[in-house]
Regions:
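Extended recognition/assembly regions associated with phosphoester-bond processing machinery
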Residues: 1-227
Length: 227
């Protein structure tokens, strides 16, 4: 099966178009947010697994569905929704979500927010065996190993030049047993940062043997104009 959700740069309506038809082929797409998501049940050798698909949420979206709830922040909004879809503690559960979890490392590629207003508390996800997160470009865990951003497969700005992209593989064993591994995703053309004088950087010896088809961000240290 394939599971997909809409993120903060997506149109939830467009992503969800044809979702009912796709579900017949085991391609599950998050619908437009209309309330807490129902689990998608699967079964493997260890028993049932519930998959929850939660698209990117803003407080206004949740207030519209639950007008009687006191929702002032992103954490309030997410908490309101997750309380209504709390997983069965006797069953294994996976949540796919797209939020900025407090404590995660961001970079310039992500959409900035003032004062971290869009941060949510990692503790909100505690009931799930694994939380597959999107939104941040750097692969990383947040707090526990099973609360993880897979990161983007490619680098989208030079602020990501030193990131090591990877694919995350998750294996669910019996309840409480989760095994994680990663595989590197080396780019065909990397992003690299160079710093030095014009003469240093144009000397053939400085780039001999390097990948000359990479994308470069160059900082010249010359104190005089280069003719």
């Amino acid at each position: 099966p394939v599971f997909a959700i809409s993120g903060n740069h997506d149109s939830a309506e467009r992503v969800a178009f044809g979702a009912h038809l796709l579900a017949g082929s085991q391609v599950y797409v998050s619908p437009v947010f209309e309330g807490a998501p129902a689990p998608i049940p699967l079964t493997d050798a260890y028993g049932p697994v519930d998959i929850y698909l939660l698209p990117f949420l803003k407080p206004a979206m949740v207030r519209h569905i639950y007008p009687d709830e006191p929702i002032e922040s992103y954490s309030d909004a997410l908490g309101c929704v997750l309380r209504r879809c709390a997983p069965d503690p006797a069953r294994r559960s996976v949540l796919v979500a797209h939020q900025f979890v407090a404590g995660a490392a961001a970079c310039e590629s992500e959409e900035p927010s003032v004062g971290g207003l869009d941060c949510v508390d990692a503790a909100l996800f505690d009931g799930f065996d694994y939380v597959a997160l999107g939104h941040l470009h750097s692969p990383q865990k947040v707090g526990r190993d099973t609360l993880r951003y897979c990161g983007t497969p490619l680098k989208y700005s030079f602020s990501e030049a030193h990131q090591h992209k990877s694919a995350t593989f998750v294996e669910l064993g019996p309840k409480g047993e989760v095994t994680l591994s990663t595989a590197p995703l080396p780019p065909k053309h990397d992003l690299r940062e160079l710093r030095g004088s014009y003469m240093e950087l144009t000397d053939r010896r400085s780039y001999a043997g390097t990948a000359t088809d990479d994308y470069l961000h160059i900082t010249l240290t010359d104190e005089q104009d280069v003719p």
